């Protein structure tokens, strides 16, 4: 009797790690981008939570007037924030080891720069991971393309704008009231409401909300009956079923009669592409607008542009907005300037 011994191939630890990282059988896909995403987002999240709760006040304007942002220093969820890195640091790379002490690093707002840089790497890696998983599953790459819109928006307010203005202190604070302050000061200094790219972003966000509500309500109103009156309509759908769960012809007919025929999509694929593309393109434009205004290419200025036959100014809404801008401008960073307006 001949015994045949089959030699088992031994794979290296690295090969097994590579197989595990790129496996689509895992409950959560890791991927090579995930190897960057997981540590960076964990770091950003951990430091944000600690700083939001316990960070001491930060000298944001570099004039020895610290601004409190954490819960333990008197703030609540609405007023609290991680305060941006000090204007005294500017755009310098400011890790913990660059400061003379931990107290100095905290006083100069080091946590903000740490959070923003790790968060930026993390969301870029998340976008790459979306593409990577789509590639492994043989899907098209448009999920990552759609996600590039919020990535571009975050990059604009956390990275591009501080670079253009010359200091991380001009970045958006990581909190609710801080975000509102950023928006108000941005309007005062750049007149963003009069910038066409911001207008496209507003059309993208509100239009996307409208189209989402229209699509959801049309589909929900044209479901194919599979249940009795006493059952939930949701019970009429079985995950993975091949047949349509709603009547697109009925939805098309309804909307075509409500508006006009060609306002209604008769192709489900082109409809869903439109639903994705509209808000994404709008947010792309807003991010591009923030990035141009970062370098002081600002919104339209129509101030005092309408005169009567005697040469007297007839105020328009543009003039009203300009007066509001001036008021916001002179109120912000009130102790940092020797002049009523920034000279930048």
Curated annotation (Swiss-Prot):
Record: residues binding chlorophyll a ChlzD1: 118
Binding positions for chlorophyll a PD1 per the UniProt entry: 198
Position of the signal peptide: none
MF term (GO), any: oxygen evolving activity
UniProt site (Stabilizes free radical intermediate): 190
Family annotation (InterPro entries): D1/D2, Photo_II_D1/D2_sf, Photo_RC_L/M, Photo_RC_L/M_CS, PSII_D1
Subcellular location field: Plastid, Chloroplast thylakoid membrane
Sequence positions that bind pheophytin a: 126
Residues that, per the record, bind Fe cation: 215, 272
Cofactor note: The D1/D2 heterodimer binds P680, chlorophylls that are the primary electron donor of PSII, and subsequent electron acceptors. It shares a non-heme iron and each subunit binds pheophytin, quinone, additional chlorophylls, carotenoids and lipids. D1 provides most of the ligands for the Mn4-Ca-O5 cluster of the oxygen-evolving complex (OEC). There is also a Cl(-1) ion associated with D1 and D2, which is required for oxygen evolution. The PSII complex binds additional chlorophylls, carotenoids and specific lipids.
GO biological process: photosynthetic electron transport in photosystem II; response to herbicide
N-acetylthreonine PTM sites in chain numbering: 2
GO cellular component, one term: photosystem II
Role noted for this protein: Photosystem II (PSII) is a light-driven water:plastoquinone oxidoreductase that uses light energy to abstract electrons from H(2)O, generating O(2) and a proton gradient subsequently used for ATP formation. It consists of a core antenna complex that captures photons, and an electron transfer chain that converts photonic excitation into a charge separation. The D1/D2 (PsbA/PsbD) reaction center heterodimer binds P680, the primary electron donor of PSII as well as several subsequent electron acceptors.
Additional record remark: 2 of the reaction center chlorophylls (ChlD1 and ChlD2) are entirely coordinated by water.
Protein name: Photosystem II protein D1
Species, as recorded: Pleurastrum terricola (Filamentous green alga)
Gene expressing this chain: psbA
């Amino acid at each position: 009797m001949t015994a045949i011994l089959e030699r088992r191939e031994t794979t290296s630890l690295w090969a097994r790690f590579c197989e595990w990282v790129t496996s689509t059988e895992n409950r959560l896909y890791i991927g090579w981008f995930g190897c960057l995403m997981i540590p960076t987002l964990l770091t950003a999240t951990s430091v944000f939570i600690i700083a939001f709760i316990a960070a001491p006040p930060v000298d944001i304007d570099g004039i020895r007037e610290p601004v409190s942002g954490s819960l333990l220093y008197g703030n609540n969820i609405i007023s609290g924030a991680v305060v941006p890195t000090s204007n005294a640091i500017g755009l310098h790379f400011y890790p913990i080891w660059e400061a003379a002490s931990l107290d100095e690093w905290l006083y100069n707002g080091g946590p903000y720069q740490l959070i923003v840089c790790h968060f930026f790497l993390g969301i870029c890696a998340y976008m790459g991971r979306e593409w990577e998983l789509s590639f492994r599953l043989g899907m098209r790459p448009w999920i990552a393309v759609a996600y590039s819109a919020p990535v571009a928006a975050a990059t604009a307010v956390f990275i591009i704008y501080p670079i253009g203005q010359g200091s991380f202190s001009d970045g958006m604070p990581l909190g609710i009231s801080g975000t509102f302050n950023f928006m108000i000061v941005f309007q005062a200094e750049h007149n963003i409401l009069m910038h066409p790219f911001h207008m496209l972003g507003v059309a993208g966000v509100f239009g996307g909300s409208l189209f989402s509500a229209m699509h959801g309500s049309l589909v929900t109103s044209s479901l194919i009956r599979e249940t009795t009156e006493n059952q939930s309509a949701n019970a009429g759908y079985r995950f993975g079923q091949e047949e349509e769960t709603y009547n697109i012809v009925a939805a098309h007919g309804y909307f075509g009669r409500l508006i006009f025929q060609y306002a209604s999509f008769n192709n489900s694929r082109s409809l869903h592409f439109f639903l994705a593309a509209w808000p994404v393109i709008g947010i792309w434009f807003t991010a591009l607008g923030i990035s141009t205004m970062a370098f002081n290419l600002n919104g339209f200025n129509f101030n005092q542009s309408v005169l009567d036959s005697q040469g007297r100014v007839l105020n328009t809404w543009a003039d009203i907005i300009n007066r509001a801008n001036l008021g916001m401008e002179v109120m912000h960073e009130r102790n940092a300037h020797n002049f009523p307006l920034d000279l930048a």
